């Protein structure tokens, strides 16, 4: 509970916590969308890889089914639901959250942890691009079973659905999000019923619960077995979302939803598909939709399309959230971030990220044309992210939880081994499309490394030319040659002990000083959100100058005017109409010689050029902002 709720002078209505079951239902609609739509294609692709063009056998079905069930148990249930979700940063999860959590305890090794965090984030974007494409395609492909005449329209219809999904993102999801949970609950219920109807016709498929069937399959199928194992991983491609979206619903509701609804429904659906294929191997073309009677095909295609849109929405929202975190942590340049809800903190829209995602998703749909072809590109990015999560979780156990080396290694080693086996299996698909998420991830990793390195060089060069603030205030306070003007001037700076460049330029060119001057520093903390009671600190230096520090979490969008207005109880009176904000706008030019390679300095210069203005990012009204330009060679 926030400190604001316990402050006696503020009369607020009592706020009841969101009911546990409501949170669980919400998590079914958001967190489990990706993993919940995997039955549309996972078993089909796994068995196609296992057969390698040969006839489907009972041993193949039982072996692959066993691998799928135990993958759900080991990776999702044991690793994520019961272990990894304990490694939260004030309720938030994800690789960048782990990076922030380790920042103050790793010290000398933090550079390596930063690289791991950036790699995990970059690979997530590869997943965010593939998930909408493969999910929507696999749902719409069900129309072929309704009537073959629909076949030519599957690709354009899928692209139309995806375009519509991305175009309406600016409206936010507040109006329809309440339906996500009930629709996905219906999806899991119908999916489980379809599985049960087929499972009762051949209960012998329950033998797949024995893990020895999976081991035997891998031992006797060589390369085809490894390819099938890579496809089996499609059953858990949404597992990382459980951890990344933890902040929206908290750990226990997500865990309850998994054990009460999602896991039983997935297991029953996969077992039902397996039972059906043991009797009707010819239905491998699309085993999910064959679970249902012919009269139910069209409604199921409609429900599947709705479920895949919801799953895609969850991944898109996750990409926005990750982009915001990366910006706040200094890994990406500033971009416009719009809030789409007045009440829900996590609902944001980032236009630039949205359109880049849409272009990439449409390219994948157009290039691969079917969910089966696209499945070869799926999995590598997620397995890479899971390996990184396991490694970082080990350091959390050691450094944050203070567990011994032996205990930490004993717990993480089995999970890391499984992750590495799946990574190796998925590496076999590199030349069939698996290179795409790796190229996307590698490119984004290069962008983040370049931006972080470039901003450090800029900061170092800026500090070198700055004047100590204490000395400056002493000299300017006794100077009689500087004119005073009415109002308040706020000078943004990254170093509160140095005189802001914008202040020096204002004095040099305008020869004036405001009657009240604020040296403002905006800090991003290593926590998701900063309580309002800890948002600001005010230090009055003398009659002319004050220092203010505003603190925001890496999940927050900084609103500087609003935060300054809240400083009234700390003795700072703020009126936006009598305040001018002075910001330094740095023009980056590639230097020769440079501290970075030529390509990197050119990339950094272009990224800086396309970064959003600080006034927009900090929500400073355009009419109150004064930008002072300066050139820096990097």
From Swiss-Prot:
InterPro entries, per the entry: K+_transporter (IPR003855), K_trans_C (IPR053952), K_trans_N (IPR053951), Kup (IPR023051)
Protein keywords: Cell inner membrane, Cell membrane, Ion transport, Membrane, Potassium, Potassium transport, Symport, Transmembrane, Transmembrane helix, Transport
Pfam families: K_trans, K_trans_C
Membrane topology listed for this record: Multi-pass membrane protein
GO CC field: plasma membrane
Transmembrane segment boundaries: 20-40, 64-84, 110-130, 148-168, 176-196, 224-244, 256-276, 290-310, 348-368, 377-397, 405-425, 430-450
Compartment(s): Cell inner membrane
GO molecular function terms noted in the UniProt entry: potassium ion transmembrane transporter activity; symporter activity
Record's catalysed reaction(s): K(+)(in) + H(+)(in) = K(+)(out) + H(+)(out)
Superkingdom in the source lineage: Bacteria
Family under the similarity heading: Belongs to the HAK/KUP transporter (TC 2.A.72) family.
HAMAP family the record matches: Kup
Annotated function: Transport of potassium into the cell. Likely operates as a K(+):H(+) symporter.
Protein name as annotated: Probable potassium transport system protein Kup 1
Provenance organism: Rhodopseudomonas palustris (strain BisB5)
Gene symbol of the encoding locus: kup1
């Amino acid at each position: 509970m926030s400190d604001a709720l316990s402050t006696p002078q503020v009369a607020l209505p009592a706020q009841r916590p969101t009911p546990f079951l409501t949170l669980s239902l919400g998590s079914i609609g958001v967190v489990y969308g990706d993993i919940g739509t995997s039955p549309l294609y996972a078993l089909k692709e796994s068995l196609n890889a296992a057969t390698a063009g040969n006839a489907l056998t009972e041993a193949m079905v039982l072996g692959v089914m066993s691998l799928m069930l135990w993958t759900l148990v080991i990776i999702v249930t044991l690793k994520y639901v019961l272990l990894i979700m304990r490694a939260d940063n004030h309720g938030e999860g994800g690789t960048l959250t782990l990076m922030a959590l380790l920042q103050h305890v790793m010290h000398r090794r933090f550079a390596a942890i930063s690289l791991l965090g950036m790699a995990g984030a970059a690979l997530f974007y590869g997943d965010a691009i593939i998930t909408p494409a493969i999910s929507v395609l696999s749902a719409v492909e069900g129309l072929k079973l309704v009537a073959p005449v629909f076949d030519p329209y599957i690709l354009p219809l899928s692209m139309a659905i995806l375009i519509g999904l991305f175009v309406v993102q600016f409206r936010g999801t507040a109006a329809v999000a309440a339906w996500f949970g009930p629709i996905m609950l219906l999806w899991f219920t119908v999916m489980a019923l379809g599985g049960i109807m087929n499972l009762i016709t051949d209960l012998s498929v329950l033998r797949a619960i024995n893990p020895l069937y999976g081991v035997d399959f891998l031992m006797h199928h060589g390369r085809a077995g490894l390819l099938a194992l890579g496809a089996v991983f499609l059953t858990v491609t949404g597992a990382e979302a459980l951890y990344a979206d933890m902040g929206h619903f908290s750990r226990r509701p997500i865990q309850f939803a998994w054990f009460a609804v999602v896991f039983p429904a997935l297991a029953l659906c996969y077992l039902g598909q397996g039972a059906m294929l043991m009797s009707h191997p010819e239905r491998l073309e699309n085993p999910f939709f064959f679970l249902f009677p012919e009269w139910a095909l069209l409604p199921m295609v409609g429900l599947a399309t709705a479920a895949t849109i919801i799953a895609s929405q969850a991944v898109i929202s996750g990409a926005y959230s990750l982009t915001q975190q990366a910006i706040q942590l200094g890994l990406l340049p500033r971009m416009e971030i719009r809030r789409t809800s007045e009440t829900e903190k996590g609902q944001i829209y980032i236009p630039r990220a949205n359109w880049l995602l849409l272009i990439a998703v449409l390219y994948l749909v157009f290039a691969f044309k079917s969910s089966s072809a696209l499945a070869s590109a799926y999995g590598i990015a997620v397995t890479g992210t899971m390996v990184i999560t396991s490694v970082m979780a080990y350091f959390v156990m050691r450094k944050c939880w203070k567990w011994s080396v032996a205990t930490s290694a004993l717990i993480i080693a089995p999970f890391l081994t499984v992750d590495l086996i799946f990574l190796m299996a998925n590496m076999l698909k590199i030349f069939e499309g698996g290179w795409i998420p790796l190229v996307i991830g590698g490119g984004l990793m290069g962008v983040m490394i370049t931006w972080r390195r470039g901003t450090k060089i800029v900061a170092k060069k800026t500090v070198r030319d700055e004047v100590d603030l204490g000395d400056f205030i002493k000299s300017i306070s006794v100077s009689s040659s500087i004119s005073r003007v009415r109002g308040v001037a706020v000078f943004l700076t990254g170093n509160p002990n140095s005189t802001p460049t914008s202040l020096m330029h204002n004095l040099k060119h305008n020869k004036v000083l405001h009657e009240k001057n604020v040296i403002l520093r905006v800090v991003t903390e290593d926590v998701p959100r900063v309580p309002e009671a800890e948002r600001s600190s005010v230090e009055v230096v003398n009659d002319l100058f004050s220092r203010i520090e505003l603190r925001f979490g890496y999940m927050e969008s900084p609103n500087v005017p609003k935060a300054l207005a809240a400083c009234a109880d700390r003795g700072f009176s703020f009126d936006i109409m009598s305040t001018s904000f002075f910001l330094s706008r740095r023009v980056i030019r590639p230097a020769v010689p440079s501290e970075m390679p030529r390509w990197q300095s050119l990339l950094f210069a272009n990224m800086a050029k396309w970064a959003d203005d600080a006034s927009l990012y900090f929500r400073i009204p355009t009419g109150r902002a004064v930008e002072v330009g300066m050139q820096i060679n990097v």
